[in-house]
From Swiss-Prot:
<comment type="function">
    <text>Involved in the import of serine and threonine into the cell, with the concomitant import of sodium (symport system).</text>
</comment>
<keyword id="KW-0812">Transmembrane</keyword>
<feature type="transmembrane region" description="Helical">
    <location>
        <begin position="17"/>
        <end position="37"/>
    </location>
</feature>
<feature type="transmembrane region" description="Helical">
    <location>
        <begin position="179"/>
        <end position="199"/>
    </location>
</feature>
<dbReference type="GO" id="GO:0015293">
    <property type="term" value="F:symporter activity"/>
</dbReference>
<feature type="transmembrane region" description="Helical">
    <location>
        <begin position="75"/>
        <end position="95"/>
    </location>
</feature>
<keyword id="KW-0472">Membrane</keyword>
<keyword id="KW-0769">Symport</keyword>
<dbReference type="InterPro" id="IPR023025">
    <property type="entry name" value="Ser_Thr_transp_SstT"/>
</dbReference>
<keyword id="KW-1003">Cell membrane</keyword>
<feature type="transmembrane region" description="Helical">
    <location>
        <begin position="39"/>
        <end position="59"/>
    </location>
</feature>
<dbReference type="GO" id="GO:0005886">
    <property type="term" value="C:plasma membrane"/>
</dbReference>
<dbReference type="GO" id="GO:0032329">
    <property type="term" value="P:serine transport"/>
</dbReference>
<protein>
    <recommendedName>
        <fullName>Serine/threonine transporter SstT</fullName>
    </recommendedName>
</protein>
<dbReference type="GO" id="GO:0015171">
    <property type="term" value="F:amino acid transmembrane transporter activity"/>
</dbReference>
<dbReference type="InterPro" id="IPR036458">
    <property type="entry name" value="Na:dicarbo_symporter_sf"/>
</dbReference>
<keyword id="KW-0029">Amino-acid transport</keyword>
């Protein structure tokens, strides 16, 4: 037994997760009635979601309270990369929709419990109000905009605190980080359960009717991950980006794919940034911020499904309108974390540009929910892995400038 345990400890976490995925698929196909097994996945995701807000608050307040004057954090470049990356993803989605026009069968039931925002202004109003949310409520509800704003305020206030108080904050951050490590080490079991649940509940062939839509969505996201993002990285760093890109996809994107939660993946991303050797002053802020505004995957979903609806209804569209759609999708995607239902519920905002009624737009949303098992997984994997990628290339660019 000890030999098996020692062998398991020596195997890398990624290989363990791979083993968990294979076992989860086999159990989902061969023993789908083991419904009690799904609780392990819920516990794993719940644990990550529970600790993530506390981790963000502890690390950000600790980093700011200990920050010395003149220390570079590269946040300006990172935010520019987040916004540009989201717009680039939206533009690629428009071009993809032109190359591979989709026709939707809009006979899906509409979830009337969900109400989309009335426009981009409402999305950003919701986002701004989250800045001044009650700090306890922000932690309890995982409102990362609120958590970040209060963590920054607390960090600035703690600059004037005694060294003993600062040491206490640092210890709290270290303790929280250690708890995160323990939870992440349970990823193989949690992901095995999540895979089992997906296969046992949906089967392996339930999405065949929407195969082309899924192919276009996933293909666009893969293109952005393996072509567009590396191109951005090359322009910034002037070196081969693929070792870093593939590492981010492997160590961040893989867990995000199965948890389907950018919030749950924040601790995973922070641990990866630490392993890469990035500055804690930077990634403690950029990673939770990225989970909120870096939404390239969401922009792709909004544009592909909106243009599929436009094609279905035979609405003519010129290039300037498509460009405007890219801007609206990018802006809306940045506020996706502030909307119940995420990127799918922002589709009616984009559809309104073409005069598509809310009832019909909500049927498009219904199609999105059907393919959501795959769409949401790929979208989260792209969004979350890009947070680490852009943080890393911004820091790399800073050190290159400093050496020059």
């Amino acid at each position: 037994m000890k030999k098996i345990y020692d062998l398991w400890v020596r195997v890398s976490l990624i290989k363990k997760i791979g083993i968990g995925v294979v076992i989860g698929v086999m159990l989902g196909i061969l023993a789908p009635d083991l419904t009690g097994f799904s609780i392990l996945g819920k516990l794993f995701v719940g644990g990550l979601k529970a600790i993530a807000p506390l981790l963000v608050f502890a690390l950000v307040s600790q980093a700011i309270s200990h920050q010395k004057k003149g220390r570079q954090t590269n946040m300006t470049l990172i935010i520019v990369l987040y916004l540009f990356g989201t717009f680039a993803s939206a533009l690629v989605a428009v071009l993809t929709a032109y190359l591979f026009p989709l026709t939707l069968v809009l006979n899906t039931p509409v979830n009337t419990e969900l109400s989309p925002p009335q426009g981009v202004a409402e999305v950003f109003q919701s986002l701004l109000l989250k800045l001044v949310d009650n700090p306890i409520n922000a932690l309890a509800t995982a409102n990362y905009i609120g958590v970040l704003s209060w963590a920054i305020i607390f960090g600035l206030a703690l600059k004037a605190a005694s060294q003993e108080t600062k040491h206490l904050i640092k210890t709290a951050a270290e303790v929280t980080s250690q708890i995160v490590v323990w939870i992440i080490n349970l990823a193989p079991i949690g992901i095995m359960s999540l895979v089992f649940t997906t296969i046992s509940e949906n089967g392996v062939g339930i999405l065949s009717d929407y195969a082309f839509l899924i192919l276009v969505l996933v293909g666009t996201m893969v293109f952005v991950a393996l072509v567009v993002n590396p191109l951005i990285a090359v322009l910034i760093t002037r070196q081969n980006p693929y070792p870093l890109v593939l590492r981010c996809l492997r160590e961040s994107g893989l867990t995000a794919f199965f948890t389907r939660s950018s919030a749950a993946n924040i601790p995973v991303n922070m641990q990866l940034c630490q392993k890469i050797g990035l500055s804690k002053d930077t990634y403690s802020v950029s990673i939770p911020l990225g989970a909120t505004i870096n939404m390239g995957g969401a922009a792709i979903t909004i544009n592909v499904l909106t243009l599929a609806a436009v094609h279905t209804f035979g609405i003519p569209i010129d290039f300037l309108t498509a460009l405007l759609l890219s801007v609206v999708a990018a802006v809306s995607a940045c506020g996706a974390s502030g909307v119940a239902g995420g990127s799918l519920l922002l589709i009616p905002v984009a559809c309104s540009l073409f005069g598509i009624s809310n009832d019909l737009a909500m049927q498009v949303v219904g199609v999105g929910f059907i393919v959501g098992v795959i769409q949401d997984s790929c979208e989260t994997a792209l969004n979350s892995s890009t947070d680490v990628l852009f943080t890393a290339i911004a820091e790399n660019a800073f050190w290159k400038r400093k050496k020059a």
